[in-house]
Regions:
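Conserved segment of the helicase C-terminal RecA-like domain
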Residues: 51-98
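Charge-dense, extended regions
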Residues: 240-346, 351-354
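Conserved helicase ATPase core of P-loop NTP-dependent helicases/translocases
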Residues: 1-35
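Acidic, glycine-rich low-complexity segments with interspersed aromatic residues
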Residues: 189-191, 198-207, 213, 217, ...
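Long, largely alpha-helical accessory region at the distal end of helicase-like NTP-driven motors
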Residues: 94-233
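SF2 helicase motor core recognition
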Residues: 28-46, 63-67
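Short glycine-/polar-rich loops that comprise or flank the Walker A/P-loop
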Residues: 41-45, 53, 70-76, 399-402
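Compact mixed alphabeta submodule
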Residues: 411-460
Length: 460
């Protein structure tokens, strides 16, 4: 073996790669080099011998061994975990390897990392696993860990404390904050923000877990425009699509629809938000953060009326149903809803169903076949000759539309998981009856970022 550092002689650095590939040496130990720009596909073992603070560098170092090569069956990664600084973030390193799960890193660690990519395996010694669990518990996964990080953030980062800087510096999934807390209250408890007493704090803190998933540019832009001037808006004079977007926001925060924009209760709730400058400011900052993170193209879907739902955006059940003028979404217990006034069939699909959440008669087999075709199983009581089955089959001739909303799991780390709107779909064919197995043809293809999740049940 040899060791290389930044000031090693050029001749030694230039010959090291050939000597490793030829087998003349078995290991190259490096410090602060080989992070990027070095390609040695034959590398089949990577050792991490000290903590790496930068997530980017960690992934670059791991990537040195991820190339395919002849006679290379796998990559073995040995990460020797020492007594690292208590602020060292193990959680983000494992989260980067677990991008296809809605479970927490703690859950994955305790259950053997069941969600790592196919062909991968993570094994930890018992003491190392406990050390990482302790690190995570003292880091971002609990109140005291968040408060500790917030209290020293500006000193640690040389950045002003705000939500965007905090999440970016620590590579943080902000759902870990908003599953239970508000950033403003945590900042007060950390001693870096003046205390406040606002009427809307409790209800908005609970709503943040739902607001954190909003990713429609059109909806966010509307909210950013109207929220700062709530006490100077005639809500009943808003246009149809704007009223629907405000309705979606109202049910997100107060968990019920606004039946009348001029009712005392509705106005009192909206004005209480206008009278809560600290929480309103955080709400606006969260929406701005969400907007900055959108990485796909969203667009309106033509449904025959001014509908605020946009293609490939994320919505809770309540949000999407009030957007379609169905004002009592809590009454729905199944994953289907026929809206005769709008001539719409709404299909709410959960791909990965657990036995404890679904009965044997509701464990439907739902998955995408490719980017344009989706296999969907109807309710177990729906036959192909029933009025519902006939409506599915002949919806185009009858002038109705089918809307497909899909989520991977029932819950995520923020609570109840929202749905992704895959747009309208047309009946192609079916087999069976009670239940019907229908193949829908989507009118817009599923983007690559979603297809890996929607077809996972048939490719693995």
């Amino acid at each position: 073996s040899i060791s290389l550092v930044g000031d090693s002689p050029d001749t030694e650095r230039n010959t090291a790669k050939k000597r490793l590939i030829s087998g003349e040496i078995r290991f190259i130990f490096v410090v602060d080099i080989y992070n990027e720009g070095v390609d040695i596909p034959a590398v089949n073992t990577v050792l991490f011998l000290r903590p790496t603070e930068s997530l980017t560098i960690f992934l670059q170092q791991l990537g040195r061994g991820l190339r395919l090569a002849d006679n290379k069956e796998c990559l073995t990664v040995l990460d020797f975990i020492g007594q690292a600084n208590k602020k060292y973030n193990f959680e983000e390193k494992f989260a980067a390897l677990l991008s296809n799960t809605n479970h927490s890193v703690q859950y994955e660690l305790k259950n053997g990392f069941v969600s790592v990519p196919k062909g991968c395996y993570i094994q930890l010694e018992k003491k190392a696993a406990q050390h990482i669990l302790d690190n995570i518990k003292s880091s971002f996964s609990n109140k005291s860990g968040l408060i500790s990080r917030i209290s020293t953030f500006e000193e640690d980062s040389d950045l002003p404390l705000n939500l965007s800087n905090f999440a970016g510096y620590y590579h943080l999934d902000i759902r870990t904050i908003y599953s239970k807390f508000s950033f403003s209250r945590l900042s007060v408890l950390a001693g870096v923000k003046a205390d406040f007493d606002e009427e809307v704090e409790d209800v908005l803190t609970r709503a943040f877990a739902r607001i954190v998933a909003i990713d429609s540019r059109r909806w966010i832009s509307f909210l950013l425009d109207i929220l700062p001037r709530l006490d100077n808006v005639d809500f009943s004079a808003l246009g149809a699509v704007e009223q629907r977007m405000l309705q979606m926001f109202y049910i997100t925060v107060w968990q019920k629809a606004a039946e009348d924009w001029n009712s005392d209760e509705v106005l009192e709730n909206l004005y209480s938000l206008a009278d809560s400058p600290v929480m309103l400011s955080e709400l606006i900052e969260l929406l701005q953060y969400n907007y900055s993170r959108i990485d796909f193209i969203d667009e309106p879907v033509e449904l025959g009326f001014d509908c605020p739902l946009d293609l490939h955006c994320t919505y809770t059940r309540d949000q999407l149903l009030v957007a379609l003028d169905y004002m009592t979404p809590s009454n729905i217990r199944e994953g289907v809803k026929w809206l005769p006034e709008k001539q719409l069939d709404v299909l709410l699909v959960t791909l990965n169903k657990s036995d404890k959440d679904y009965s044997p008669t509701t464990m439907y087999k739902d998955y995408s076949i490719n980017e344009s075709l989706f296999h969907w199983q109807s309710q177990s009581t729906t036959s192909d000759i029933s009025p519902t089955g006939q409506r599915y089959i002949h919806h185009r001739q009858r002038g109705s539309q089918v809307l497909l909303f899909v989520r991977e799991f029932k819950t995520d780390i923020a609570g109840t998981a929202p749905y992704t709107f895959l747009g309208t779909a047309d009946y192609l064919r079916h087999t069976g009856s009670r239940p019907m197995n229908i193949i829908w043809r989507l009118n817009r293809p599923i983007p690559a970022k979603f297809i890996k999740k929607t077809n996972k049940l048939i490719v693995g």
